[in-house]
Curated annotation (Swiss-Prot):
Organism annotation: African swine fever virus (isolate Tick/Malawi/Lil 20-1/1983)
SS bond partners: 195-237
Cytoplasmic side: 261-329
Xref: Gene3D superfamilies: Ribonuclease Inhibitor
Protein name in UniProt: Transmembrane protein I329L
């Protein structure tokens, strides 16, 4: 009986070793800031993500989470997806799905992408073009608990991390893998390195020098990325800048015209007030004719005798004017 029992124990353990653990995955679709649960199709170890006929037309985000999958990739899982659908999402979360290559979903990164969570997968390299897209869009990205390796293909990532470290990189010590994180406001990028005995900062400097020495053609990738990002950002503002400059020029010209008009008006009034012309006050019993004469003393007395009932036009002398002024005082 003991031998039979031992035989069945070994047989059961052998069968258990051959049976793959049950993989349970679920994904959620975000619509109107609410996450709705859907079923995930798994065919021959392949996650069909998402189920095309069950996604709302106004979906804004997708989240896929798998369980019973070792994030160090003992399970060989691949992902199939619909790129045209993923491009419409602002929020993409594929967690613990055993993804080996980010290019499997990078084709679905559209301009609307505002958040990316790829934790607990088996990513080994971050492709340069994908990193460039994430940097330009300033997309908050979670990459920790992956298996990112050393080598030429990750050199742009080292440059990027080292450049960020100058201002806001925080190093967290780990016993096994070096965890390197940087944070900038709401943007986070966590990176696990599976090689090197040095602390995170020293390793980044060492690896960056290695990349610069062995692969000088990648030496300015991050600077180029940031420059292109700023250039593209400012290109969108060019029409507004031109309109602002034009409006400023018109306003400045209008102010100059108003200022010149006020100066001219003030100058002409001042000149008129300082004039040496002597105007004769009107006396009710007389009418003076000043036609074609600037000075009343030289005015010619007009003859109105030919006209009936015409008043006599008389030019008073200087003494009479003085006497008239004294009487008025």
């Amino acid at each position: 009986m003991l031998r039979v029992f031992i035989f069945f124990v070994f047989l059961g353990s052998g069968l258990a070793g051959r049976i793959k653990p049950q993989i349970t995955c679920k994904y959620f679709i975000s619509e109107n800031n609410t996450w709705y649960k859907y079923n995930v199709t798994i065919l021959n170890g392949t996650i069909v993500l998402p189920a095309y006929n069950m996604i709302p037309t106004k979906a804004a985000g997708i989240s896929c989470t798998c369980h019973d999958i070792d994030y160090l990739q003992k399970n060989n899982i691949s992902i199939h997806y619909n790129t045209s659908i993923l491009k419409t999402f602002q929020d993409i979360r594929i967690i613990r799905c055993g993804m080996k290559n980010i290019s499997e979903i990078a084709g679905g990164f559209g301009k609307e992408l505002k958040f990316l969570d790829l934790r607990y997968n088996n990513l080994q390299f971050i492709d340069y073009n994908i990193l460039r897209k994430l940097i330009r869009s300033n997309t908050p990205t979670y990459l920790y608990y992956n298996n990112l390796m050393c080598g030429k293909r990750n050199c742009p990532l080292y440059y990027f991390l080292l450049k960020q470290e100058q201002t806001y990189l925080k190093l967290l010590p780990q016993f096994f893998l070096r965890r390197i994180s940087f944070s900038n406001n709401n943007t986070y990028l966590y990176h696990f390195l599976s090689c090197g005995n040095k602390p995170g900062h020293e390793f980044l400097e060492y690896q960056t020098k290695y990349c610069r020495t062995k692969f000088p053609e990648i030496n300015i990738t991050v600077n180029q990325l940031i420059t292109k990002k700023n250039t593209e950002r400012y290109k969108n503002c060019y029409p507004f800048v031109l309109v602002s400059i034009l409006c400023s020029c018109i306003s400045f010209l209008f102010l100059i015209i108003c200022l010149l008009r006020s100066i001219c008006k003030k100058y002409s009034c001042t000149k008129q007030g300082k004039s040496t012309h002597k105007y004769i006050p009107l006396i009710p019993s007389y009418t003076f004719s000043l036609k074609k004469h600037r000075h009343p003393e030289t005015a010619v007395v007009e003859d109105h005798t030919t006209t009936a009932n015409s008043p006599i036009v008389y030019i008073p002398t200087t003494e009479e004017k003085k006497a008239s002024c004294s009487r008025r005082k």
